[in-house]
């Protein structure tokens, strides 16, 4: 599933290609894929999104991102948010697959179309009436962006008895971290994912915030993690998966200490960690 790093890779690549240029909706796919209400509360009500809502005829003034959500903001105030879900792709490339296309735009002065596709159909698009409406919705639904999270911000939400891994996956607490980068960040910070939030002290919260930013920036620099579907906006696979220290490596030796990596299901997700490098403060005791 695309996480913050993959969405940021797409934003950075698309920015010079679409900002300042006009969009024309060339093709609209299944309406249920595009059925997302506007803002919090109405987001549960499916509604048809017409070409105007898809920024037909609009000039893109900027691209914004918070967490895993990407917004195209038009000069006339219209906003369209794209969520890639599990397998979504947003690319301006000649090799964008013809199947599972949900919206295709023609971009002025660009040879290739901009395509949003999602084979597994967990993604979608959401129109907003204005940038102010967008920010209100994001402030209501999303926590601080993980790429800029600070130690004090993270310490403020590290409360209660749930596992720190579960907290990192909560988009209302910190936006953008998913299963891959939660595992990688906890490893870099040396924190056992089973540690209770209340047991993570202020100094360790600062270390974890630093680790989150470091892991995400490294992933962005290397094009994001391509495990299956992720492609950059130019249709290329990322290389960040080659840097994974723990994610997907259960039973293999730790790259740092050589201990065999362990895994368990936490917060409904497979979680991998090193028993030698990641401290167990407040963690569940083994039975």
Segments (PLM) and residue ranges:
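Short linear motifs in intrinsically disordered/low-complexity regions
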Residues: 96-98, 140-142, 146, 230, ...
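Acidic, proline/glycine-enriched N-terminal capping motif
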Residues: 1-133, 137, 276-287
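Short, mixed-charge, low-aromatic patches
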Residues: 108-116, 137-144, 163-171, 211, ...
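Catalytic cores of large soluble enzymes that bind and process phosphate-bearing ligands
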Residues: 2, 6, 146, 204
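A short, charged helix-loop
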Residues: 120-162
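Basic, nucleic-acid-binding surfaces and adjacent catalytic neighborhoods in DNA/RNA-processing proteins
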Residues: 22-50, 64, 157-287
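Short capping loops/turns at secondary-structure boundaries
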Residues: 96-100, 147, 170, 175
């Amino acid at each position: 599933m695309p996480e913050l790093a993959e969405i940021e890779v797409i934003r950075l690549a698309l920015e010079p290609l679409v900002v300042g240029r006009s969009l024309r909706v060339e093709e609209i796919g299944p309406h249920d894929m595009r059925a997302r209400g506007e803002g919090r509360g109405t987001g549960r009500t499916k509604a048809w999104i017409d070409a105007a809502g898809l920024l037909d005829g609009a000039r893109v003034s900027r691209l914004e991102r918070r967490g895993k959500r990407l917004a195209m903001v038009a000069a006339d105030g219209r906003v369209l948010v794209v969520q890639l879900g599990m397998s979504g792709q947003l690319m301006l490339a000649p090799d964008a697959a013809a199947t599972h296309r949900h919206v295709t735009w023609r971009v002025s002065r660009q040879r290739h179309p901009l395509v949003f596709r999602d084979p597994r159909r967990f993604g979608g698009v959401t129109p907003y009436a204005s940038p102010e409406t967008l920010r209100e919705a994001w402030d209501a639904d999303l926590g601080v962006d993980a790429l800029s999270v600070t130690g004090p911000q993270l310490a403020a939400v590290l409360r209660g008895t749930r596992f720190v891994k579960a907290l990192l996956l909560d988009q209302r607490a910190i936006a953008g971290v998913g299963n891959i980068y939660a595992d990688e960040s906890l490893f870099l910070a040396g924190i056992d994912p089973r540690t209770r939030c209340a047991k993570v002290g202020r100094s360790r919260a600062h270390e974890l915030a630093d680790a989150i930013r470091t892991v995400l920036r490294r992933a962005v620099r290397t094009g994001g993690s391509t495990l299956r579907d992720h492609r950059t906006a130019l249709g290329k696979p990322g290389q960040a998966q080659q840097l994974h220290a723990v994610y997907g490596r259960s039973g293999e030796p730790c790259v740092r200490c050589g201990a065999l990596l362990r895994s368990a299901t936490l917060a409904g997700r497979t979680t991998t960690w090193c028993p030698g490098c990641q401290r167990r403060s407040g963690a569940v005791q083994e039975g």
